[in-house]
A protein has these predicted regions:
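Residues on a specific face of well-ordered alpha-helices
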Residues: 61, 136, 140, 160-161, ...
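Phosphate/pyrophosphate-binding betaalpha-module
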Residues: 124, 128-187
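A conserved active-site cap/scaffold subdomain adjacent to cofactor or substrate pockets
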Residues: 151, 168-232
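Flexible, glycine/charged-enriched surface loops at secondary-structure junctions
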Residues: 17-18, 150, 221-231, 257, ...
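Metallocofactor- and cofactor-centric catalytic cores in central/energy metabolism, strongly enriched
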Residues: 1-118, 132, 140, 144-145, ...
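Glycine-rich beta-alpha junction loops
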Residues: 25, 128-130, 156-160, 177-180, ...
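Internal helical hairpin/lid segments
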Residues: 210-300
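Short catalytic-loop micro-motif centered on adjacent basic/acidic residues
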Residues: 18-20, 101, 122-125, 151, ...
Length: 342
């Protein structure tokens, strides 16, 4: 029986484009040297699986508006601080007097609000199915603690709608293991009926190699497929507890993705009974239209239309020290991975 490495190195089938949906997969594939094993007819492209990267410019502008115009203390993950908005980043806003507090979880933000009752505190809630439950729990805790100074600015997204929107960009999706651990595999299985093929992958060298080998073998059969190559963590049903929590507190809404535009029913928002914690409603926020830097091709990278190295400012005007786009800022960003490992 051939090993996964032998299957990959000796692949002699048709050209195939495999999209790494997850930014962690992109970094690990680079770090482990897996790209060097691929024959020329196998192309790995990056996708929209970095939550910071797909967060639109308008969201950064909204956060800056809250901080500078409303005097709100912004609690955020560190990756978001240096992402450029239309005119500045959150780091730039901090230089102008904004209160930007870095936290490691929504629970930290809720705790901060409880310890600082004289401050209005908003947590920037970004991410996919893996992080949405934690944001919900922080809102529940705020209600239980009687906090009226805590809210969340929601930009949480769901992945299946993005897969469908990008189905013509790749032949096979390398599905993120941690997302499917929450959602289960049923949604991805159902996408095969739409012609979408994919494999769920873990994050070790063995797990990634196995998933890629399975993808190449199944692709040659010529019909849509789904295989769970991460069964020790991912089940068909996923985490029912997390799903029920999110369903109790949030509902689907149309959502803007950087580079992909508005994808129907791909976002989340707080249900009516929790809307006193919705920062957009609490502060009667006006509609803000963000304008990305025209030199940045982050949107094309996220759609698999180009590689980071195809961007004219990659490694020149745009570096991790001086990023123009979100894909260079985030630790999960494709541009960051290419810059670090190329």
């Amino acid at each position: 029986m051939k090993t996964a490495r032998e299957i990959i190195e000796n692949y002699d089938g048709p050209d195939v484009r495999i999209m790494e949906v997850c930014g962690t997969h992109t970094h690990e594939i680079f770090r482990l040297g897996i790209r060097k094993l691929l024959p020329k007819q196998v192309e790995l492209i990056s996708g929209p699986g970095c939550p910071v990267c797909v967060t639109p410019v308008s969201f950064i502008d909204e956060a800056i508006y809250l901080a500078l115009e409303k005097g709100v203390t912004i609690c955020t993950f560190g990756d978001l601080v240096r992402v450029p908005g239309t005119n500045m980043s959150l780091a730039g806003a901090r230089e102008q007097g904004a209160k930007i507090h870095i936290v490691y979880s929504p629970a930290d933000a809720e705790k901060y609000a409880g310890e600082h009752p004289d401050e209005q505190v908003t947590f920037l809630s970004v991410g996919f199915e893996t992080t949405t439950p934690a944001g919900c729990l922080s809102v529940k805790a705020a209600r239980e603690d009687g906090l009226d100074n805590y809210s969340i600015l929601v930009a949480n997204k769901t992945m299946p709608q993005a897969y469908e929107a990008l189905k013509d960009s790749a032949d096979v999706f390398l599905y993120p293991g941690h997302v499917n651990a929450i959602t289960g595999t049923r949604l991805c299985e159902a996408l095969t009926e739409e012609g979408v093929s994919g494999v769920v992958a873990g994050f070790t060298a063995k797990e990634l190699m196995t998933a890629l080998a399975v993808a190449l073998v199944k692709f040659q059969e010529g019909k849509p497929f789904f295989v769970n190559c991460y069964p020790r963590v991912v089940t068909q049903d996923g985490s029912r507890e997390a799903q029920l929590l999110v369903d109790e507190m949030m509902e689907a809404c149309d959502c803007e993705w950087r580079g992909l535009g508005v994808i129907p029913k791909s976002g989340m928002k707080l249900r009516q009974e929790w809307q006193e914690f919705d920062a957009r409603l609490k502060y009667q926020m006006p509609k803000i239209e963000g304008k990305p830097n025209p030199a940045c091709r982050c949107g094309d990278v996220l759609q698999g239309k180009c590689k980071p190295s195809d961007c004219k400012v990659f490694g020149k005007g745009c570096t991790p020290q001086h990023p123009i786009g979100a894909c260079m800022v985030s630790g999960e960003g494709a541009c960051s991975a290419y810059y670090q490992y190329s």
